[in-house]
Protein backbone atom coordinates (compact mmCIF):
# COMPACT_ATOMS: atom_id res chain seq x y z
CA UNK A 1 0.00 0.00 0.00
CA UNK A 2 1.61 3.25 -1.14
CA UNK A 3 1.77 6.32 1.07
CA UNK A 4 -0.38 8.28 -1.37
CA UNK A 5 -3.11 5.64 -1.41
CA UNK A 6 -3.06 5.45 2.40
CA UNK A 7 -3.47 9.24 2.59
CA UNK A 8 -6.44 9.09 0.22
CA UNK A 9 -8.14 6.32 2.22
CA UNK A 10 -7.62 7.96 5.63
CA UNK A 11 -8.56 11.38 4.29
CA UNK A 12 -11.74 10.09 2.68
CA UNK A 13 -12.82 8.24 5.84
CA UNK A 14 -12.09 11.31 7.96
CA UNK A 15 -14.09 13.65 5.72
CA UNK A 16 -17.03 11.26 5.36
CA UNK A 17 -17.67 10.64 9.06
CA UNK A 18 -17.00 14.25 10.03
CA UNK A 19 -19.30 15.58 7.34
CA UNK A 20 -22.08 13.06 7.93
CA UNK A 21 -22.34 13.12 11.73
CA UNK A 22 -20.69 16.31 12.92
CA UNK A 23 -19.80 16.51 16.61
CA UNK A 24 -21.68 13.32 17.44
CA UNK A 25 -19.72 11.14 15.02
CA UNK A 26 -16.44 12.84 15.96
CA UNK A 27 -17.09 12.13 19.65
CA UNK A 28 -18.16 8.52 19.12
CA UNK A 29 -15.17 7.74 16.91
CA UNK A 30 -12.91 9.43 19.47
CA UNK A 31 -14.03 6.87 22.04
CA UNK A 32 -12.94 4.11 19.67
CA UNK A 33 -9.71 5.94 18.87
CA UNK A 34 -8.92 6.23 22.57
CA UNK A 35 -9.11 2.50 23.22
CA UNK A 36 -7.23 1.63 20.02
CA UNK A 37 -4.51 4.20 20.75
CA UNK A 38 -3.98 3.41 24.43
CA UNK A 39 -4.50 -0.31 23.97
CA UNK A 40 -2.27 -0.60 20.91
CA UNK A 41 0.71 1.20 22.39
CA UNK A 42 0.33 -0.32 25.85
CA UNK A 43 0.27 -3.86 24.46
CA UNK A 44 3.24 -3.08 22.23
CA UNK A 45 5.66 -2.35 25.07
CA UNK A 46 5.81 -5.85 26.67
CA UNK A 47 6.00 -7.54 23.26
CA UNK A 48 8.84 -5.31 22.10
CA UNK A 49 10.82 -5.48 25.34
CA UNK A 50 10.51 -9.27 25.38
CA UNK A 51 11.84 -9.54 21.83
CA UNK A 52 14.90 -7.37 22.50
CA UNK A 53 15.90 -9.12 25.72
CA UNK A 54 14.25 -6.87 28.28
CA UNK A 55 14.70 -3.30 29.47
CA UNK A 56 18.23 -4.04 30.73
CA UNK A 57 19.29 -4.93 27.19
CA UNK A 58 17.96 -1.60 25.91
CA UNK A 59 19.76 0.35 28.64
CA UNK A 60 23.12 -1.30 27.93
CA UNK A 61 22.93 -0.30 24.25
CA UNK A 62 22.24 3.38 24.92
CA UNK A 63 24.57 6.07 26.28
CA UNK A 64 23.63 7.12 29.84
CA UNK A 65 22.73 10.67 28.81
CA UNK A 66 20.13 9.30 26.38
CA UNK A 67 18.06 8.07 29.33
CA UNK A 68 18.05 11.37 31.19
CA UNK A 69 14.85 13.38 31.51
CA UNK A 70 16.72 16.66 30.97
CA UNK A 71 18.81 15.66 27.94
CA UNK A 72 17.30 18.37 25.73
CA UNK A 73 18.00 21.09 28.31
CA UNK A 74 15.81 22.99 30.77
CA UNK A 75 15.29 25.90 28.39
CA UNK A 76 13.70 23.57 25.84
CA UNK A 77 11.70 21.71 28.49
CA UNK A 78 10.23 24.89 29.97
CA UNK A 79 9.50 26.26 26.50
CA UNK A 80 7.69 23.08 25.46
CA UNK A 81 5.65 22.98 28.68
CA UNK A 82 4.50 26.57 28.18
CA UNK A 83 3.80 26.06 24.48
CA UNK A 84 1.81 22.84 24.89
CA UNK A 85 -0.05 24.11 27.95
CA UNK A 86 -1.25 27.14 25.98
CA UNK A 87 -2.00 25.35 22.70
CA UNK A 88 -3.38 21.96 23.77
CA UNK A 89 -5.87 23.43 26.23
CA UNK A 90 -7.16 26.00 23.75
CA UNK A 91 -7.08 23.97 20.54
CA UNK A 92 -10.27 23.07 18.72
CA UNK A 93 -9.91 19.39 19.55
CA UNK A 94 -10.07 20.35 23.27
CA UNK A 95 -12.44 23.33 23.23
CA UNK A 96 -15.08 21.36 21.32
CA UNK A 97 -15.14 18.74 24.07
CA UNK A 98 -15.44 21.39 26.78
CA UNK A 99 -18.51 22.96 25.21
CA UNK A 100 -20.05 19.58 24.36
CA UNK A 101 -19.99 18.51 28.02
CA UNK A 102 -23.35 18.45 29.83
CA UNK A 103 -22.17 20.95 32.46
CA UNK A 104 -19.13 22.84 33.73
CA UNK A 105 -18.23 20.20 36.31
CA UNK A 106 -18.12 17.49 33.66
CA UNK A 107 -15.92 19.64 31.42
CA UNK A 108 -13.46 20.35 34.25
CA UNK A 109 -13.40 16.73 35.43
CA UNK A 110 -12.94 15.45 31.90
CA UNK A 111 -10.02 17.77 31.21
CA UNK A 112 -8.31 16.77 34.48
CA UNK A 113 -8.72 13.05 33.78
CA UNK A 114 -7.47 13.57 30.24
CA UNK A 115 -4.39 15.41 31.51
CA UNK A 116 -3.56 12.60 33.96
CA UNK A 117 -3.96 9.92 31.28
CA UNK A 118 -1.80 11.88 28.83
CA UNK A 119 0.93 12.39 31.45
CA UNK A 120 1.05 8.67 32.24
CA UNK A 121 0.70 7.53 28.64
CA UNK A 122 3.56 9.78 27.49
CA UNK A 123 6.07 7.21 28.78
CA UNK A 124 4.74 4.46 26.48
CA UNK A 125 5.80 5.88 23.08
CA UNK A 126 8.99 7.14 24.76
CA UNK A 127 9.92 3.56 25.65
CA UNK A 128 9.26 2.43 22.08
CA UNK A 129 11.43 5.29 20.83
CA UNK A 130 14.31 4.25 23.10
CA UNK A 131 14.00 0.66 21.90
CA UNK A 132 14.15 1.88 18.30
CA UNK A 133 17.26 3.93 19.03
CA UNK A 134 18.93 0.98 20.76
CA UNK A 135 18.10 -1.61 18.10
CA UNK A 136 18.28 0.59 15.00
CA UNK A 137 20.99 3.25 15.57
CA UNK A 138 20.63 6.33 13.40
CA UNK A 139 16.93 5.74 12.73
CA UNK A 140 14.83 8.79 11.90
CA UNK A 141 12.53 9.80 14.74
CA UNK A 142 9.45 9.81 12.48
CA UNK A 143 10.03 6.15 11.57
CA UNK A 144 10.79 4.85 15.07
CA UNK A 145 7.39 3.42 16.03
CA UNK A 146 6.71 1.91 12.61
CA UNK A 147 10.16 0.31 12.45
CA UNK A 148 9.82 -1.20 15.92
CA UNK A 149 6.33 -2.50 15.19
CA UNK A 150 7.21 -4.09 11.86
CA UNK A 151 10.50 -5.64 12.98
CA UNK A 152 9.97 -6.59 16.62
CA UNK A 153 6.31 -7.55 16.84
CA UNK A 154 4.00 -10.24 15.43
CA UNK A 155 2.12 -9.08 12.30
CA UNK A 156 -1.24 -8.80 14.08
CA UNK A 157 0.21 -6.72 16.91
CA UNK A 158 2.16 -4.58 14.44
CA UNK A 159 -1.07 -3.84 12.61
CA UNK A 160 -2.73 -2.91 15.90
CA UNK A 161 0.07 -0.45 16.70
CA UNK A 162 -0.10 1.15 13.27
CA UNK A 163 -3.87 1.44 13.69
CA UNK A 164 -3.17 3.26 16.96
CA UNK A 165 -0.97 5.77 15.12
CA UNK A 166 -3.70 6.33 12.54
CA UNK A 167 -6.27 6.72 15.34
CA UNK A 168 -4.27 9.57 16.87
CA UNK A 169 -4.14 11.34 13.51
CA UNK A 170 -7.83 10.87 12.75
CA UNK A 171 -8.87 12.01 16.22
CA UNK A 172 -7.01 15.31 15.94
CA UNK A 173 -7.88 15.76 12.26
CA UNK A 174 -11.62 15.34 12.78
CA UNK A 175 -11.71 17.90 15.58
CA UNK A 176 -9.69 20.45 13.65
CA UNK A 177 -11.73 19.93 10.49
CA UNK A 178 -15.03 20.32 12.32
CA UNK A 179 -13.69 23.34 14.20
CA UNK A 180 -12.68 25.14 11.01
CA UNK A 181 -16.07 24.44 9.44
CA UNK A 182 -17.87 25.67 12.57
CA UNK A 183 -15.89 28.91 12.66
CA UNK A 184 -16.66 29.55 8.99
CA UNK A 185 -20.36 28.76 9.38
CA UNK A 186 -20.96 30.62 12.66
CA UNK A 187 -18.62 33.59 12.33
CA UNK A 188 -18.94 34.29 8.61
CA UNK A 189 -22.02 32.70 7.06
CA UNK A 190 -24.41 33.05 10.00
CA UNK A 191 -23.04 36.46 11.00
CA UNK A 192 -23.73 37.96 7.58
CA UNK A 193 -26.67 35.87 6.36
CA UNK A 194 -28.02 34.25 9.54
CA UNK A 195 -31.42 35.94 9.52
CA UNK A 196 -32.25 34.58 6.09
CA UNK A 197 -30.92 31.04 6.60
CA UNK A 198 -32.58 28.07 8.27
CA UNK A 199 -30.78 25.57 10.50
CA UNK A 200 -30.87 23.06 7.66
CA UNK A 201 -29.14 25.53 5.35
CA UNK A 202 -26.47 26.32 7.95
CA UNK A 203 -25.86 22.59 8.40
CA UNK A 204 -25.49 22.24 4.64
CA UNK A 205 -22.94 25.06 4.55
CA UNK A 206 -21.02 23.43 7.39
CA UNK A 207 -20.89 20.08 5.60
CA UNK A 208 -19.76 21.70 2.36
CA UNK A 209 -17.03 23.48 4.28
CA UNK A 210 -15.87 20.19 5.82
CA UNK A 211 -15.75 18.64 2.36
CA UNK A 212 -13.87 21.59 0.85
CA UNK A 213 -11.31 21.84 3.67
CA UNK A 214 -10.89 18.07 3.73
CA UNK A 215 -10.04 18.00 0.03
CA UNK A 216 -7.50 20.80 0.53
CA UNK A 217 -5.93 18.92 3.46
CA UNK A 218 -5.64 15.74 1.38
CA UNK A 219 -4.00 17.63 -1.48
CA UNK A 220 -1.50 19.25 0.90
CA UNK A 221 -0.73 15.83 2.40
CA UNK A 222 -0.04 14.40 -1.04
CA UNK A 223 2.21 17.30 -2.02
CA UNK A 224 4.12 17.69 1.25
CA UNK A 225 4.81 14.90 3.75
CA UNK A 226 5.67 17.39 6.53
CA UNK A 227 3.18 20.08 7.56
CA UNK A 228 5.26 21.84 10.24
CA UNK A 229 7.86 23.32 7.82
CA UNK A 230 4.98 24.83 5.85
CA UNK A 231 3.82 26.73 8.94
CA UNK A 232 7.14 28.34 9.88
Residue ranges of predicted features:
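Membrane-embedded helix-loop-helix hairpins and adjacent transmembrane boundary segments
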Residues: 1-232
